[in-house]
Curated annotation (Swiss-Prot):
It comes from Acinetobacter baylyi (strain ATCC 33305 / BD413 / ADP1). The gene is queC. Zn(2+) binds at residues 192, 202, 205, 208. Belongs to the QueC family. This is 7-cyano-7-deazaguanine synthase. Coiled coil: none annotated. ATP binds at residues 15-25.
Amino acid sequence: MNGEFGMRPRAIVLLSGGLDSTTCLAWAQARYECMALSFMYGQRSTTELDAAKAIAQNAGVEHRVINIDLANLGGSALTDHNIDVPEQLQEGIPVTYVPARNTIFLSYALAAAEVFGAEAIVIGVNAVDYSGYPDCRPEYIQAFTNMARLATKAGVEGKPLTFETPLLHLSKANIIRLGIEHGVDYSQTVSCYQADAQGRACGKCDSCRLRKQGFIEAGVTDPTRYIPQ
């Protein structure tokens, strides 16, 4: 990107390669000049990152990948292969929660926004059809927004960043409908917590369950490639 965007307002979009973040990118492109930001953080399945690279390329946006070794800490089924990804619903915060992940990701996005002069950060957190992660709640986003006002040059100078959460109060079905309206090709996306090397989904984890149900409720054919059972 070389530090330059076009003439439209600028935004950093967190892009995992999954359904929600890809919908966010399409939504953001209708409003902003976008840079997509992804993370290699030691996640169990890296095919989502392959998907993110392809999605960003097809969308024609600059894409940066940040390397962080959260697997060195473990503490989650997504970063520790000794912890199984559950295939049944769990009470409380599930073992697929990665400690402080959104805080870490948003902090990098905040730095990128300052460096590249972005006015907004777009993240696909959702508090309706989600797995119960504490860093996907409205009060978390508000708290991070308040922190960013205090911790950044832009905030101190009276030009605080906007944190856009277009999916926050949408059901998975309505997220899919929004993406379809913006031309999203969901066959490119990978949502599964334990997708195989070809990006095929297990069809059993919580992320797969929410995704499957979303397509059913949206009345849209599910383009997901599943591992043969």
